Amino acid sequence: MNVNQVDLETVCGVTSVLPENTQPEFAFAGKSNVGKSSLINGLMNRKSFARTSSQPGKTQTINFYHLNEKLYFVDLPGYGYAKVSSELKAKWGKMIEKYLRTSTQLKVIFLLIDIRHEPSANDKDMYEWIVHNGFEPVIIATKLDKINRSQRDKHIKMVRTGLCAGANTKILPFSSLSKEGKDDIWRCIEQFLEVPDTENK
């Protein structure tokens, strides 16, 4: 998809009222510093529209990006950051769960996992929550450029096994440097749009 227009339309904090959007939403979840903002920027063909940071826990809001006036990317706060207080973690958790349970337009929850490491306990909990609530789990294995090409299959298997994911669960590797995997992610997104977009990506 050619992303010609992007607007950061809504930013929701822990006390905010969630928007009632009328177009498809695609949420991105993952632990802090897994490369969520870099992925979103890569998919939107923007260098720094979604704020990236070397400091885990930077994203503390739910950010709604409106693309081409036809769909939304929803950037969820990263989980598992040790330096965030327990009280704030609880508030984030409630905020995220409220969105995921109440959105009427949410089509897919993309769960980002660092391909270099086995899924954490928080990753496993999030995956189980996605499945339990009836969503089709789609895993994006980030930081693909950090491992050798010969190690890819081994690490993808490690992610699948660590999550206890079935053979049919999609695991889409992605590199924020080369953008390898970007087209596969867009094809997945387009399957859930009412009119699949066949423009060149």
UniProtKB/Swiss-Prot annotation:
The keyword Methyltransferase does not apply. Its cofactor is Mg(2+). HAMAP family: GTPase_EngB. One of its GO terms (molecular function) is metal ion binding. Mg(2+) binds at S37, T59. This is Probable GTP-binding protein EngB. SUPFAM superfamilies: P-loop containing nucleoside triphosphate hydrolases. Belongs to the TRAFAC class TrmE-Era-EngA-EngB-Septin-like GTPase superfamily. EngB GTPase family. The lineage of its organism: Bacteria, Bacillati, Bacillota, Clostridia, Lachnospirales. The keyword DNA repair does not apply. Necessary for normal cell division and for the maintenance of normal septation. Signal peptide: none annotated. Keywords: Cell cycle, Cell division, GTP-binding, Magnesium, Metal-binding, Nucleotide-binding, Septation. Residues 22-195 form the EngB-type G domain. GO terms for cellular component: cytosol. It comes from the Bacteria. GTP binds at residues 30-37, 57-61, 75-78, 142-145, 174-176. InterPro entries: G_ENGB_dom, GTP-bd, GTP-bd_ribosome_bio_YsxC, P-loop_NTPase. GO terms for biological process: division septum assembly.
